[in-house]
């Protein structure tokens, strides 16, 4: 099929007209910036779970968020982008998925589950950080007591948004020289674009409110440090932008049906996700001097008390 369309096809319709070299080049360019994100997520998880477990043991949302981000990037590298930009694999891979449809039934809902879980976790990350400055004495105790309930809520909530992807038929959509996996909606109005737009828009608004409160409260602390406040503000703004970019593209697909059906929408959308998935670990590393030191084994001088506010607020 032509590269300017993306429609479901029940058979195998790989387009041999695309240059293997050029398509493979596109793939490796994307891997070149996705791979560092895998390294950062992996390094963060190793530091948090293994190397400095005692220091980060009370930051569970931090760990869960990193794990979700890591899985999403790995799925992008080894499934989503691989079968779009490596035409050599189109025919054998398409035959394999058609012969084993349960893999499509597993992959597509999982992908959307993770995309939904990510913003839910972000909501609790930002509220957790806000509570650390509003109620510094009781905040840690509160989150420890309620973590199990909140985790269960995070695990269940995405199913209220991905149910249509679970019950609908999964298909291969042949695109450029390869293909990607999508679904034929049983319930036409229940689209993932609509649901993700709602979720991510809510996250952006909640993040703006909670981080504004956090920054306002920090500005009234007696031993505040201007540099720390500025770093926190920039980090929060960057994290909001990371969620805002995919939310904007989801909105374009929802509010403009012609754009939502255009092949270019399917081309651009993954790059909007990249802003979030690649940007998030960078924001984590940038925002926390403690995490940055541990992740890269950087020896640093003893920090003043006021600096610990930033570390605590961004890793909570």
Curated annotation (Swiss-Prot):
* Similarity comment: Belongs to the nematode receptor-like protein srg family.
Q: What's one Pfam family here?
A: Srg
Kindly state which keywords UniProt assigns to this record, in alphabetical order. Answer: Membrane, Transmembrane, Transmembrane helix
Subcellular location field: Membrane
Quote the PANTHER family the UniProt record gives. SERPENTINE RECEPTOR CLASS GAMMA-6-RELATED, SERPENTINE RECEPTOR CLASS GAMMA-RELATED
Q: What is this protein called?
A: Serpentine receptor class gamma-8
Which terms does the record give in the GO molecular function aspect? transmembrane signaling receptor activity
- Which InterPro entries does this UniProt record tie to the protein? 7TM_GPCR_serpentine_rcpt_Srg, Nematode_SR-like
Q: Which domain of life is it from?
A: Eukaryota
Q: How does it sit in the membrane?
A: Multi-pass membrane protein
User: TM spans, by residue?
Assistant: 28-48, 60-80, 106-126, 147-167, 186-206, 235-255, 267-287
One of this protein's GO BP terms?
sensory perception of chemical stimulus
């Amino acid at each position: 099929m032509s590269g300017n369309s993306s429609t479901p096809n029940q058979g195998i319709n790989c387009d041999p007209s695309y240059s293997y070299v050029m398509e493979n080049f596109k793939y490796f360019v994307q891997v070149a910036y996705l791979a560092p994100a895998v390294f950062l997520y992996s390094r963060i998880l190793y530091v948090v779970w293994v190397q400095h477990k005692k220091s980060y043991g009370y930051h569970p949302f931090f760990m869960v968020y990193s794990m979700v981000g890591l899985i999403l990037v790995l799925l992008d590298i080894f499934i989503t982008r691989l079968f779009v930009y490596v035409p050599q694999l189109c025919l054998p891979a398409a035959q394999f998925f058609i012969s084993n449809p349960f893999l499509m039934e597993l992959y597509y809902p999982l992908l959307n589950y993770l995309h939904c879980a990510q913003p839910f976790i972000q909501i609790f990350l930002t509220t957790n950080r806000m509570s650390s400055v509003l109620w510094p004495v009781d905040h840690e105790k509160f989150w420890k007591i309620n973590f199990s309930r909140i985790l269960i809520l995070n695990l269940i909530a995405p199913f209220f948004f991905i149910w249509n992807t679970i019950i609908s038929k999964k298909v291969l959509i042949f695109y450029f020289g390869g293909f990607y996996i999508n679904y034929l909606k049983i319930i036409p109005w229940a689209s993932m674009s609509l649901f993700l737009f709602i979720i991510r828009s809510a996250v952006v608004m909640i993040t703006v409110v909670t981080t504004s409160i956090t920054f306002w409260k920090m500005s009234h602390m007696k031993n505040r440090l201007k540099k720390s406040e500025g770093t926190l503000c920039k980090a929060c703004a960057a994290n909001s932008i990371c969620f805002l970019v995919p939310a904007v593209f989801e909105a374009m697909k929802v509010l403009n049906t012609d754009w939502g059906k255009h092949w270019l929408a399917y081309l651009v959308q993954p790059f909007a996700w990249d802003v979030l998935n690649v940007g998030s670990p960078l924001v984590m590393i940038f925002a926390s001097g403690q995490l940055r030191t541990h992740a890269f084994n950087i020896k640093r001088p003893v920090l003043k008390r006021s600096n610990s506010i930033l570390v605590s607020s961004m890793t909570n």
